[in-house]
C-alpha cells in the first residue's frame, strides 16, 4: 500500500472501531499510524505519525481530525524530557514536532502513540477492558485471561511518562499484542492496520468472554425488596413529576439541561444491594470525571416513595452532595488548581425510576448519561470477577482539575446567554 493511503486506512479503522460502543466510549480513545513520506523541503524520506487529535470521536473521525507529526522530532523529546513532575510541559513541545501545518491539535496521548514502537496503535476505553483494569487484582486477572499475550501497565495519569511506561513494557514483552492500562483502558498494536484492529478486538472480546464465563451470577448482589423498577407507565409518570425538581437542583450553580434514561442496565443497578457502596466509589476511566463528576447523587428511598417524599429527600441529599463535593475539592486542591467548577451532581439516580443526567446542552447531558452506563458496565464486570477498585480519589481530582483539561475547557466557545434555559411559550397557536 502506498503511503498516501496510510491516513485513509487509519480513518477507516477508527470509524469501524468507534461505531461499536463495546469498543470505546463516546469521544474516548485514539488511534495512530506511522509511515514514510518524502519531505518536500529536503526530498529525503521522513517518518510521520498520524494520530487522532484532541477532541472528536473515533466513530466520526475525518482526516482533518488527525494531527501529523515528524517521528524523529517526537522521539527526540525523550532526550529533553524533564521527568514526570514536569511532564505537562511536553504537550507544548508537540507543536514543534508538527509536519507542515500539522492538522488537528495533538492530544495528551500523542506521546504513547509516538514512543511505543509499533506501526499501528489503538488506545481504547472498552467496558470489558476497563472492568479488568479496575479489578482489585487486575494484574493477576489480566495474566489469567490473556497469558503473556497481553501485558499489564500500572495506573498512571495519561501523559508523556505513561507513553514511556508502555513503550518499556512492550520492549520487555515482545510477544504481547497490547496492554491493559490499570484503572484506565487498553492499548493494542500491530504491524499492519488490519492486524492492529484485530488485536484490539481480540483483547476486548477475550476480556468480555472471560468476565462472562468466570464471573459470578449476581455481581451487584441481590435485589433489595422495594427497589425494583416500577411498571413503565408509573415510572415515566414519576420521572416526569420529578424532572423539573431534579433539573432545578442540578442547575443551582449554572443552568443545565437534563436527559433521562430508564434502560434495563440502569434499573437493574438501581435495584441491587451494592448500588450505594459502588456509586460511592465513583467512576474510574479518566474520560469520565469531567462528564459525570466522580460520584452520582443516589436517592435512598424505595421505588414506591411518593413524589412529595422523594422531592423532600432530594433536596436534603442535594445539600449534602454539594457539601461533600466542596470537601472533595478542598481536600485535594493546590494553589495552582483551577477554581471549583460547581458542586451540583451531573448524575442523579432514583431507584425504581431511572437516571437523570445533566450538561450544558442536550448532547452533553445525553453523553453524561451514556458515560454513567459505561461506568455501570465496568463496575458489573469488575465485581463479577473480583472487587471494583477504581483509582484513588486524589488521582481523580488531579484529572478533573488538570490544568491541561482546564485549558481545553477555556478554549471552548462560551455558552450563549440563553443556553441551558427553557422558555415556555403559551398562546402562540392562535
Ligand atoms: Zn485513555
Residue ranges and their predicted role:
Residues 1-424:
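Glycine-rich flexible loops
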Amino acid at each position: 500500500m502506498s503511503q498516501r493511503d496510510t491516513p485513509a486506512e487509519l480513518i477507516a479503522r477508527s470509524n469501524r472501531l468507534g461505531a461499536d460502543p463495546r469498543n470505546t466510549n463516546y469521544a474516548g480513545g485514539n488511534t495512530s499510524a506511522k509511515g514514510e513520506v518524502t519531505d518536500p523541503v529536503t526530498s529525503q524520506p521522513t517518518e510521520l505519525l498520524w494520530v487522532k487529535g484532541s477532541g472528536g470521536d473515533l466513530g466520526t473521525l475525518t482526516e482533518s481530525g488527525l494531527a501529523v507529526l515528524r517521528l524523529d522530532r517526537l522521539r527526540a523529546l525523550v532526550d529533553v524530557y524533564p521527568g514526570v513532575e514536569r511532564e505537562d510541559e511536553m504537550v507544548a513541545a508537540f507543536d514543534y514536532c508538527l509536519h507542515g501545518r500539522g492538522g488537528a491539535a495533538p492530544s495528551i496521548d500523542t506521546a504513547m502513540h509516538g514512543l511505543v514502537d509499533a506501526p499501528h496503535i489503538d488506545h481504547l476505553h472498552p467496558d470489558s477492558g476497563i472492568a479488568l483494569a479496575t479489578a482489585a487484582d487486575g494484574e493477576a486477572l489480566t495474566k489469567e485471561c490473556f497469558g503473556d499475550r497481553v501485558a499489564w501497565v500500572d495506573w498512571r495519569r495519561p501523559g508523556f511518562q505513561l507513553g514511556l511506561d508502555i513503550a518499556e513494557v512492550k520492549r520487555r514483552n515482545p510477544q504481547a499484542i497490547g496492554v491493559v492500562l490499570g484503572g484506565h483502558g487498553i492499548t493494542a498494536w500491530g504491524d499492519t492496520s488490519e492486524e492492529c484492529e484485530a488485536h484490539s478486538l481480540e483483547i476486548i472480546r477475550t476480556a468480555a468472554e472471560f468476565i462472562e464465563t468466570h464471573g459470578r451470577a449476581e455481581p451487584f448482589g441481590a435485589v433489595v425488596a422495594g427497589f425494583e423498577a416500577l411498571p413503565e407507565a408509573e415510572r415515566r409518570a414519576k420521572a416526569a413529576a420529578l424532572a423539573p425538581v431534579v433539573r432545578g437542583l442540578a442547575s443551582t450553580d449554572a443552568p443545565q439541561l437534563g436527559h433521562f434514561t430508564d434502560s434495563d442496565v440502569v434499573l437493574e443497578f438501581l435495584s441491587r444491594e451494592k448500588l450505594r457502596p459502588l456509586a460511592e466509589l465513583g467512576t474510574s476511566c479518566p474520560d469520565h470525571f469531567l462528564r459525570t463528576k466522580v460520584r452520582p447523587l443516589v436517592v435512598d428511598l424505595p421505588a414506591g416513595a411518593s413524589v412529595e417524599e422523594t422531592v423532600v429527600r432530594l433536596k436534603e441529599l442535594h445539600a449534602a452532595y454539594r457539601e461533600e463535593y466542596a470537601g472533595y475539592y478542598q481536600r485535594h486542591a493546590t494553589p495552582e488548581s483551577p477554581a471549583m467548577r460547581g458542586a451540583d451532581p451531573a448524575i442523579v439516580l432514583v431507584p425504581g425510576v431511572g437516571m437523570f443526567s445533566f450538561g450544558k446542552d442536550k448532547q452533553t447531558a445525553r453523553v453524561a448519561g451514556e458515560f454513567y452506563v459505561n461506568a455501570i458496565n465496568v463496575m458489573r464486570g469488575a465485581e463479577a470477577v473480583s472487587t471494583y477498585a477504581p483509582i484513588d480519589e486524589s488521582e481523580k481530582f488531579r484529572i478533573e482539575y488538570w490544568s491541561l483539561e482546564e485549558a481545553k475547557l477555556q478554549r471552548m466557545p462560551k455558552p450563549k446567554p440563553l443556553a441551558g434555559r427553557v422558555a415556555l411559550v403559551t398562546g402562540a397557536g392562535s
